Amino acid sequence: MQVSVETTEGLGRRVNITVTADSIEKAVESELRNVAKKARIDGFRKGKVPMNIVAQRYGASVRQDVLGDLMQRNFVDAIIKEKLNPVGAPKYVPGEYKLGEDFAYAVEFEVYPEIELKGLDTIVVEKPQVDVNDADVDAMIETLRKQQASWSVKEGEVGAEDRATIDFTGSIDGEAFEGGKATDFVLAMGQGRMIPGFEDGILGHKAGEEFVIDVTFPEDYHAENLKGKAAKFDIVLKKVEERELPEMTAEFIKRFGVADGSLDGLKAEVRKNMTRELKNAVRNRIKAQVLDGLVLANEIDVPAALVDGEIDVLRRQAAQRFGGNEQQAMELPRELFEEQAKRRVIVGLLLGEVISKSELKADDARVNALIEEMASAYEDPQEVIEFYSKNKELMNNMRNMALEEQAVEALLSQAQVSEKATTFNELMNQPQA
C-alpha cells in the first residue's frame, strides 16, 4: 500500500492510496474460499463446488465487496500511520479499477484543528457580588401577586399598569403592511411587547377614543421590509382594565406550596428559590465571560462537518419547541443557526483542549452536587435523584456539565478576576451572551 497526504483547503485533507494488484487478488481468493464453503449450487454438494465455478458465479460481486473492504481498511491504516484525526464521514473517491492492475483511490475529509492555547492570562472577568435582600423578596412576592391578579373594567385613562383592548391598523406612506393589523388585541402596559413608542401612544387615552400613533420601527426589527421605517397606527381603544391584586390570605399563600399558609413561610420559600436562581445566574455570568475571553484569545479554524452537525441539532431543538417534526426541522434555513453553531463548536474544541491539557476528569462529588441542586427545584428531590442515577444518558450529561465547570474553573484560575457589586434585578435582567 502506497500513501500520500495532501492539504486541500484549511482543514481539508486528501489521502491518496494505492493498493497492489497482488494484495487484491489474495483478498479475493481468500473470500472466494469462504464463499465456497457455504455455496449451494445444483449438482454439487455443499462445500464441494470447484473454485472455478465459484469464481464464475460469485467472482464479480466478491471482487466488488473486497475492493470496498480494502478501501476502508487501508484508509484506517493510513490515518493511523499518518497520525490524522478525521472529522465527520470521509468521502471515498475511487479510481478506475482494471483487473490485474494496482488500484488507486482517494479519500477526502476534514481534520480537527491543532490547538495551542494562548492568552489565558488576558481573560477578564467581573465576578458579581450580590445577595438576595428583603426588598428583593418583597418585590418577587408582589410579582407573584400580579401574575395571579384578576382584571376589571375601569373608567378613565389607560395607566402604566393597566390593560387595553384595541383594534389597530398600521400603514407606511399610506399603505397597509402585512402583520400590521389586529382586532380585539389585548395589550398589558409596561411589558415591552410592542415597538418603542406604541405603548406610550396608548397611555392617557380612554375607552371609545379613536386616534393615530406615529412610531418608527427599530433598525434591528426582524422583518426586513420594516426596519427603520416610520409608520402610523390607527387605534380604536375598546376597553380599559385595571389589575386587582389578590389578598395575602393563607389560601392564596398555600398555592405556592407553603403548607402553613403563613407570610413568613412564603418569604422563606421565595428566598430559597431566588437564592438558587441567583447562584445559577452568577455561575452563568462568570462562565460567559470566561468563554468569551477564551474565544477572543484563540482564533481557530472550524471543521465544516462539526458546524453542519451542530446546525442540525439546533434545527431539531427549534422544531421541538414549536411542535415541528424532523422534516420541518431540516427545512429551517441554516442561516438562522450558523453563527450560534460555529460558536458552540469553537467553545467545545477549546474547552476540550483545556480538559486534555489539564488532565481533568469529572469529579463524582461535583456530579452529585449538580444533580442534588437541580433536584431541589422539584417537589420530591429524592425521586429525581434516583431517576438520574438509573439513567446512563442523563448521568453522562451531568458528568459533562461537571467537567465543563471544572474546565471553566481552571481557566478562571489564570484569568484577571475582579469583583463588582450588583443587585439581584440587575444580574437577573442582564442579557445573556
Swiss-Prot record:
Alphabetical keyword list: Cell cycle, Cell division, Chaperone, Cytoplasm, Isomerase, Rotamase
Which residues constitute the signal peptide according to the record?
A: none
- Domain named PPIase FKBP-type: residues: 161-246
Does the record carry Chaperone as a key word? yes
Gene Ontology terms, cellular component aspect?
cytoplasm
Cross-referenced PROSITE patterns, in alphabetical order?
FKBP_PPIASE (PS50059)
Where does it live in the cell?
A: Cytoplasm
GO biological processes: 'de novo' cotranslational protein folding; cell division; chaperone-mediated protein folding; protein transport; protein unfolding
Q: Which PANTHER family match?
A: TRIGGER FACTOR CHAPERONE AND PEPTIDYL-PROLYL CIS/TRANS ISOMERASE, TRIGGER FACTOR-LIKE PROTEIN TIG, CHLOROPLASTIC
Q: In its UniProt entry, what is this protein called?
A: Trigger factor
Source organism lineage?
Bacteria, Pseudomonadati, Pseudomonadota, Gammaproteobacteria, Enterobacterales
